[in-house]
């Protein structure tokens, strides 16, 4: 299936059915009272996040979604039937924006989440509602309300904990294959990856995280060169970036340090917030080098890029702010287990810190509410 991560659609809810003007027709009752029923509600249009849907391709072909109108009311106090709602299944991670107001209508972040995109109109009132002591035979009824209509921009940003960043052919697809069940296309030429791939990295029965591989970046990506610029947005929801570098390129004229600096430059030009995300360095393809050459190339690379990556004896004692360096071979799996265990540890600690911060903010808000409550002269809270 073709990977489509953007689409524009129009959604239109149904109109409510008109209320009925009707009177009872009974033998020997010359002036039967009003019995016109209400109209049915118009159908609404909903978006629902579906973990089994991976692309917005369907919305490239069908641009307009129209719910049906409600049925009109009937005599004998019979109400019109309401129209069925339309439910549009969208991938988890879809951002929905109103094209007219630029308002974010919904951010679908979990499976089963439902959001109303266009509300159906209410049914009109039948004349039974207008009977009064001075008007025993009202002829008025009301029309159904119009349903909402919206023009929407759909944008898919994949939900992943970790994002892979690097030049084409750096070995990102091989890495995601080595540590997860994902099976992206792999070949020894640039731009093998043409769309984002997601892999679930399972540490044990209770611990796992999602890794995203996007097409490789090249210089000028922020201005639209290559493929990666279209997919950089998919890294915006990640909590950690892995910058994968080919330490042993087949082309000896390629300078890994220059390529790495170009990647970071493109990242910064594209989005300052994305540039500021925690970023670990992963030097790949160690299987192509002997131990001495790998050490020499690593030292030369770090000196050329000017990045400071400490290497303590116990790597598991890193604090959250320290950048980390890993030397791996995705092909032979050398160093990959240490990498995924540290990622898991980092994400667990990050989650704990965020939970503590949220709890502290909640407690502070509760204190503020209490302090704002009026008190008596004795300091006792005064009831509202």
Swiss-Prot record:
Mg(2+) binds at residues 173, 193. It holds the Pfam family GTP1_OBG. It is found in: Cytoplasm. GTP binds at residues 166-173, 191-195, 213-216, 284-287, 329-331. The keyword Magnesium applies. Residues 1-159 form the Obg domain. It is an enzyme of class 3 (hydrolase). Monomer. This is GTPase Obg. It comes from Neisseria gonorrhoeae (strain ATCC 700825 / FA 1090). The lineage of its organism: Bacteria, Pseudomonadati, Pseudomonadota, Betaproteobacteria, Neisseriales. The gene is obg.
């Amino acid at each position: 299936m073709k990977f489509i991560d953007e689409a524009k659609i129009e959604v239109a809810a149904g109109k409510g059915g008109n209320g009925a003007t009707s009177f009872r027709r009974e033998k020997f009752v010359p002036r039967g009272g009003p019995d016109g029923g209400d109209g049915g509600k118009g159908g609404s249009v909903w978006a629902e996040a579906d973990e089994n849907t991976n692309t917005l391709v369907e919305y490239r072909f069908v641009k307009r979604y129209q719910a049906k109108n409600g049925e009109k009311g009937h005599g004998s106090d019979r109400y019109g039937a309401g129209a069925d709602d339309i439910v549009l299944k969208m991938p988890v991670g879809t951002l929905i924006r109103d094209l007219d107001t630029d308002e974010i209508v919904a951010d679908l972040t979990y499976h089963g989440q439902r959001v109303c995109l266009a509300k159906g109109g209410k049914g009109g009132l039948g004349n039974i509602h207008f009977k009064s002591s001075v008007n025993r035979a009202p002829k008025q009824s009301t029309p159904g309300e119009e349903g909402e209509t919206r023009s929407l921009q759909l944008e898919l940003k994949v939900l992943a904990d970790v994002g892979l960043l690097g030049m084409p052919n750096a070995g990102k697809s091989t890495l995601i294959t080595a540590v997860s069940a994902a099976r992206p296309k792999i070949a020894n030429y640039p731009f093998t990856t043409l769309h984002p791939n997601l892999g679930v990295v399972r540490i044990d029965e209770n611990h796992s995280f999602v890794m995203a591989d996007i097409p490789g970046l090249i210089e000028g990506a922020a201005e639209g060169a290559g493929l990666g610029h279209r997919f950089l947005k998919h890294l915006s929801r990640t909590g950690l970036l892995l910058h994968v570098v080919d330490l042993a390129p087949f082309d000896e004229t390629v300078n890994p340090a220059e390529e790495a600096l170009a990647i970071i430059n493109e990242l910064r030009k594209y989005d300052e917030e994305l540039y500021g995300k925690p970023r670990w360095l992963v030097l790949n393809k160690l299987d192509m080098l002997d131990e001495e050459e790998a050490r020499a190339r690593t030292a030369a690379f770090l000196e050329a890029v000017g990045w400071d990556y400490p290497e303590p004896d116990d790597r598991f004692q890193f604090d959250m702010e320290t950048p980390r360096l890993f030397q791996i071979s995705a092909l032979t799996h050398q160093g990959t287990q240490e990498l995924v265990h540290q990622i898991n540890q980092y994400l667990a600690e990050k989650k704990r810190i965020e939970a503590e911060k949220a709890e502290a903010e909640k407690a502070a808000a509760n204190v503020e509410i209490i302090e704002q409550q009026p008190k008596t002269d004795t300091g006792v809270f005064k009831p509202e």
